[in-house]
Amino acid sequence: MFEHLSLLLLLLIFAAAAGAVWIAGTYLSNTTDVLSTRFGMGEALGGMILLALVTNLPEIAITVSASLSGHLEVAVGNILGGIALQTVVLVVLDVFGVGKQSSLTYRAASLVLVLEGVMVIAVLTVAVIGSQLPDTLIFARVTPASLLIFLLWAVGLWLIGKAQKNLPWQAHGPTLPGDQPEERGHSKKKKDDNARQQQHSTTRTVLVFLAGAAVTLAAGVLLERSGEAIAGHIGMSGVLFGSTVLAATTSLPEVSTGLTSIKMGDYQLAVSDIFGGNAFLPVLFLLASIISGKAVLPHAGKTDIYLTGLGILLTSIYLFGMIFRPRQQIARMGIDSFLVLVVYALSVLGLVAISGSQ
């Protein structure tokens, strides 16, 4: 349907869908925080699970749409390509959120965040392993790699929840200079207090949440369909378009959510939202295989494996930043963010080279 539309009309549809994702994503993140506080969901359920689902609704919609239409390579590119770019969102938060105060990782330093980053690396490593397995290795519409990714994610959430509550170095350790003064997640309580002051009932909040989810899902489908047609019009590789332009567009909710958290002084939550979303994205391979009835990861191409390695590298840079907590800044960003930006910019040249050789 979209292939027959003019390039101008396709660009308008894509831009409108991107705007819808940005606006709806803002409402979704705010209502999610309010609802998780009112229903007492806790950090694990209300944070890393529910918010990961909410901020990744565009990716979920694109994965479902691509799986139903048989474009499994688009589903793979959407999942793996988005992780590297969503990590670059931390650069945006460092520059426009924290600014000249100090680096983001200096403010957000937490060993729990290091564990979250390790979980991202773990699920991405399994994704690389799964891409090398034969596509005939599937039973009851489930592949070993996609199931292992889901189990790693679930166990990782449990361990992170345990680390936040029971490990003495986290729960009772001394406060370090420059740490955020309030506990992680305090911005959620503030959002709930503001909603109560404005007399926003739970019913109204739920309705806004559902409306935002519906708009985001519909916009995600439009982004995938119009983006694929745009790539065809301009002669650009669909995988390259998906891992750059489309991935940047679907990362808009994370930008909005992160800037809001940093504005309220919740630096750790801002980083956790990115790591939590990145760890959740590979879980969508299980959803894609169930919908399509095929092994999805073996459809990963050179570009997808390249981007997965890039995601691991960028995450590793930030893990070093969490541990060493650099205060020095370059162009309003921490040294780690500067390195991430440089590595990502150079990696785009590699993407072009890979696309040109195929």
Model-found features: residue ranges?
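Hydrophobic alpha-helical segments, chiefly the membrane-spanning helices
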Residues: 1-358
